[in-house]
Amino acid sequence: MGLKEDLKALEEEAKKLIEEASDIGKLNDIRVNYLGKKGKIKSILKTLGKLSPEERKEIGQLANRIKDELEEALKEKTELLKKKALEEELRKNRIDITLPPQWIESGSSHPVISTLIEISQIFISMGFSVAEGPEVEKEKYNFDMLNIPPDHPARDMQDTFFLNNGDILRTHTSPVQIRTMLKHKPPIAVIAPGRVYRKDADPTHSPMFHQIEGLLVDRDVTFRDLKGILKIFLESVFGKDTKIRFRPSYFPFTEPSAEVDIGCTVCGGKGCRVCKGTGWLEILGCGMVDPEVFKAVGIDPEEYTGFAFGLGIERIAMLKYRITDIRLLFTGDMRFNQQFKGIR
């Protein structure tokens, strides 16, 4: 068999292998075996020196044609295999839009968070700013500078969480007011929302709960201003027809001090189990800032007056949404939260 026949035989052999190849790796092997530097076609061409010039030209042209055709065949088969691989990948990852969707349970805003946001927005609309502070607090800011003496019951280990280094978990957000007055000079109008901690746990109390306190300090601030602000707030939360009353009370950091009640939201003031037959619900504490507190933060009580108030967010949420057990607010049960979805 001559060189021409050998080349044509290699051509047919290579084209058959290319046609049968099932992956790109096999095509690469064919390229190396037939077209590589040590491939079969190259081996045949090494014998061209034994031929006459006319035969070398003819065989050379034939070899070049075969190489070009094999390269083209390899290219086409490579593109075909890549296309098939892509189609297979798309087939495997195809989304069947006829399948019923997987149910994804959606959450909803927690009633405490909803209430906190609502209350904050009411006071912000009246010109108050939001102030924040640390939850791990110094006794100095939590008690001493708020005119709470060392022998006060609130400072007992039965009521306060004390840490090993002498710090405490804040029992109210009043320390934020102290820090604000130390940092800023009057006029001051801030609310301080956040988590607070007390050793108490029953259906109406939690060792951790949310509180929001307010402080306004300026010249000529009166108790009438305090009553007006709280009236706007309570009517915004519970409705324009809400009955409100102020009762004299005592807090170490305010003087005079008052407790604020609203007409029972359950019985309408007629008397029920929730209001214990009184027709009233205790809602918050308030008062005029004690001069001793002003002195502790370097504000002249002869020049400035101010008022402060504080309330529990959980308390407001329970009254607004008629929740009977505070522990329900901390279960993390989505079924409970979803009851309040879309309710404001």
Swiss-Prot record:
The keyword tRNA-binding does not apply. Binds 2 magnesium ions per tetramer. One of its GO terms (biological process) is phenylalanyl-tRNA aminoacylation. It is an enzyme of class 6 (ligase). Mg(2+) binds at E255. Pfam families: Phe_tRNA-synt_N (PF02912), tRNA-synt_2d (PF01409). It is found in: Cytoplasm. Its cofactor is Mg(2+). One of its GO terms (cellular component) is cytoplasm. The keyword Protein biosynthesis applies. InterPro entries: aa-tRNA-synth_II, aa-tRNA-synth_II/BPL/LPL, Phe-tRNA-synth_IIc_asu, Phe-tRNA_ligase_II_N, Phe_tRNA_ligase_alpha1_bac, Phenylalanyl-tRNA_Synthase, tRNA-bd_arm. It catalyses: tRNA(Phe) + L-phenylalanine + ATP = L-phenylalanyl-tRNA(Phe) + AMP + diphosphate + H(+). One of its GO terms (molecular function) is magnesium ion binding. Keywords: Aminoacyl-tRNA synthetase, ATP-binding, Cytoplasm, Ligase, Magnesium, Metal-binding, Nucleotide-binding, Protein biosynthesis. Gene3D superfamilies: Bira Bifunctional Protein, Domain 2. It comes from the Bacteria. Its EC number is 6.1.1.20. Belongs to the class-II aminoacyl-tRNA synthetase family. Phe-tRNA synthetase alpha subunit type 1 subfamily. Tetramer of two alpha and two beta subunits. This is Phenylalanine--tRNA ligase alpha subunit. It comes from Persephonella marina (strain DSM 14350 / EX-H1).
